[in-house]
Amino acid sequence: MIVSTPHGMNMFYKLWTDAKSKKNDYIPVEVHWSEVPGRDEVWKEETIRNTSQSQFNSEFECEFLGSIDTLIAPHKLKVMPYVDPIQSHADLDIFERPDPAKTYFLTADVSRGTSQDYSAFLVFDVTQMPYRVVAKYRNNEIKPLLFPQKIYEVAKAYNECFVLVEVNDIGEQVANALQFDLEYDNLVMASMRGRAGQILGAGFSGGRAQLGVRTTKSVKRVGCSNLKQLIESDKLLIPDYDIMSELSTFVVKGSSHQADDGCTDDLVACLFIFAWAVDQQYFKELTDNDIRERMYREQKDQLEQDMAPFGFIDNGIDDPEVEVDEYGTRWTTVVRDHNTDW
């Protein structure tokens, strides 16, 4: 018997959902607070007043997503399905095998390999929308010297896909190894454009080019905003449980978003780097997909209904008489006030 209070999409959440869908041998039994003698609406209001709504939802409403500060809306996270990978080996989970007719895009987040954080990458099918995660790698012990080889092998398998590496810290070493040691051709670069920030490209667009993207506050803010829109509008499909688990603990911290205390966000970092990239002109040229234009067309009718047309109000005062002569000059009548010089 396993007894637990729901708290986030952790291991117990997976055991519970698998039991409800009969994927394991556990029998799910749920006890709601209203079934306990002596607990009524008065008790509920008093408990919420002394704690918080999110804490009550988690401890007594048996909701795994008690937080309301997640980047992705909790009601969306609840209905996002996950599936088992068709193949798993050496920390690599594959959900769809490579298809020679499709286009793929890989984003990587690099750690120092000290077991505190994970080095991770995700492979996306960007042939058409909705985009899909087709492969995932995550390891908290792999060293930066070995991580480029893993990226290289998977990227080559997925049709030599485009690769975008986060280069804030040790990631620059990984990007350099891919470019110069392994001579991988499809490494995506970014150029600094002054106040415009970083622009995705192949290194020929002017400005100071770098191998990969530096996760600045601007990149993260735009990436998180785009990611929220992509997921909540079903333009990005995520079949992986680990990613959804990280999304359930990726919460507001100050003016930004980051993993909750004791949690990680390396897979989410791969997601918001991808979400930042999809709105770049270079990405649209690579994939022939304009996500902004596509979403606008789908929501055009709703947007036009929300934008009420401007009208004209008759204030009851006649406009002054205007005469236009043959030369186009406009003449108006002036009424003289005898109490002045006019």
Language-model-derived ranges and their functions:
Residues 101, 114-120, 130:
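Short, flexible loop/turn motifs enriched in small residues
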Residues 71-100, 149-157, 285-342:
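C-terminal regions of RecA-like/P-loop NTPase motor modules
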Residues 9-11, 15-18, 127-254, 309-342:
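Mg2+-dependent endonuclease catalytic cores in nucleic-acid-processing enzymes, primarily RNase H-like
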Residues 35-110:
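ATPase catalytic-site recognition across NTP-hydrolyzing enzymes
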Residues 239-307:
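Charge-patterned, long linear interaction tracts outside catalytic cores
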Residues 2, 28-30, 105, 186-189, ...:
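Conserved beta-strand scaffold positions in the cores of enzyme catalytic domains, especially
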Residues 1-51, 174-179:
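ASCE P-loop NTPase helicase motor core
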Residues 122-124:
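Conserved hydrophobic/aromatic positions in well-ordered beta-strands
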